[in-house]
């Protein structure tokens, strides 16, 4: 990955749910990125762990357009698992590799402020504002931020409503990358690349083409928030990519060699 002299060297990385798997190499790649002088900012999800604990507690998992309906009881599980268990497992793994890391959530220092999307999906929300003060302070102290997408419910909050929100980690990653004007936004997923209308893998797409994939319905499911977040980041001057995190060392390969999945830029389309 080439850095310009004006680069802030910030790379925002959205970690998929496999990062705690002993065979996953993504966290090991973080150590290499630090050695290369980059400043990784990690955002994680943990939907499968939330679902597993919900089942243990006898709570039904309900999804609308692939996102979790978040009632009071589910919000408790989301906050405990994402801002607690999953976040601290990742931080502990990084510390074990000699990387100074700190786990925070969107609530801390009002890093992510949001509002409820719709009454029928409960405390499922959308990002309204990003405050980068805490993230920047950690980076300046050479500490890697590990961010849970549990966020602060302040905007248009009804009287008596909860102060926490469950926000999808994909848009959180895009908004943070945009606010930080990061050099790169990387999504580690369980697919090799974004697919075109004929099912072909797309190696590089322009922002306009990404928007067409969304508007036409070619992009579906979990790819929708990822592509939207890539568009958000490119508008702020970042480049963005979606790569297969299941393959060993794909993160470091993408950032040093490139061409590992789908890159969203303002340039011409290249198919792989």
Swiss-Prot record:
PANTHER family: N-ACETYLGLUTAMATE SYNTHASE, N-ACETYLGLUTAMATE SYNTHASE, MITOCHONDRIAL. Transmembrane segments: none annotated. This is Acetylglutamate kinase. The gene is argB. GO terms for cellular component: cytoplasm. One of its GO terms (molecular function) is acetylglutamate kinase activity. The record marks 14, 226 as: Transition state stabilizer. It holds the Pfam family AA_kinase. It comes from Dehalococcoides mccartyi (strain CBDB1). Keywords: Amino-acid biosynthesis, Arginine biosynthesis, ATP-binding, Cytoplasm, Kinase, Nucleotide-binding, Transferase. InterPro entries: AceGlu_kinase-like_sf, AcgluKinase_fam, ArgB, Asp/Glu/Uridylate_kinase, Glu/AcGlu_kinase. It catalyses: N-acetyl-L-glutamate + ATP = N-acetyl-L-glutamyl 5-phosphate + ADP. It comes from the Bacteria. It is found in: Cytoplasm. Substrate binds at residues 46-47, 68, 166. Coiled coil: none annotated. One of its GO terms (biological process) is L-arginine biosynthetic process. Pathway: Amino-acid biosynthesis; L-arginine biosynthesis; N(2)-acetyl-L-ornithine from L-glutamate: step 2/4. Catalyzes the ATP-dependent phosphorylation of N-acetyl-L-glutamate. The keyword DNA-binding does not apply. Belongs to the acetylglutamate kinase family. ArgB subfamily. Its EC number is 2.7.2.8. The keyword Calcium does not apply. It is an enzyme of class 2 (transferase). Its main location: cytoplasm.
């Amino acid at each position: 990955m080439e850095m310009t002299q004006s680069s802030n060297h910030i790379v925002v990385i959205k970690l998929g749910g496999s990062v705690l798997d002993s065979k996953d190499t993504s966290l090991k790649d973080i150590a290499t990125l630090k050695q290369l002088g980059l400043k990784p900012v990690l955002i994680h999800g943990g939907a499968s762990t939330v679902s597993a604990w919900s089942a243990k507690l006898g709570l039904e998992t309900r999804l609308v357009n692939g996102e979790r309906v978040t009632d009071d009881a589910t919000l408790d599980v989301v906050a405990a698992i994402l801002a607690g268990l999953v976040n601290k497992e990742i931080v502990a793994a990084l510390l074990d590799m000699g990387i100074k890391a700190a786990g925070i959530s969107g609530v801390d220092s009002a890093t992510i402020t949001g509002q409820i999307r719709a009454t029928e999906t409960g405390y499922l929300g959308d990002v309204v504002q990003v405050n980068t003060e805490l993230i920047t302070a950690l980076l300046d102290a050479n500490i890697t931020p590990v961010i849970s997408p549990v966020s602060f419910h302040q905007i248009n909050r009804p009287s008596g409503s909860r102060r926490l929100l469950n926000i999808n980690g994909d848009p959180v990653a895009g908004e943070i990358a945009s606010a930080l004007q990061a050099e790169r936004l990387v999504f580690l997923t369980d697919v090799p690349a974004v697919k075109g209308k004929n099912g072909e893998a797309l190696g590089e797409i322009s922002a306009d083409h990404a928007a067409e994939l969304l508007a036409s319905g070619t992009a579906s499911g979990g790819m929708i928030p990822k592509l939207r977040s890539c568009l958000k980041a490119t508008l702020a001057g970042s480049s963005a990519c979606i790569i297969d995190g299941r393959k060993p060392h794909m993160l470091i390969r993408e950032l040093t060699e490139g061409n590992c999945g789908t890159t969203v830029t303002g340039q011409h389309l290249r198919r792989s």
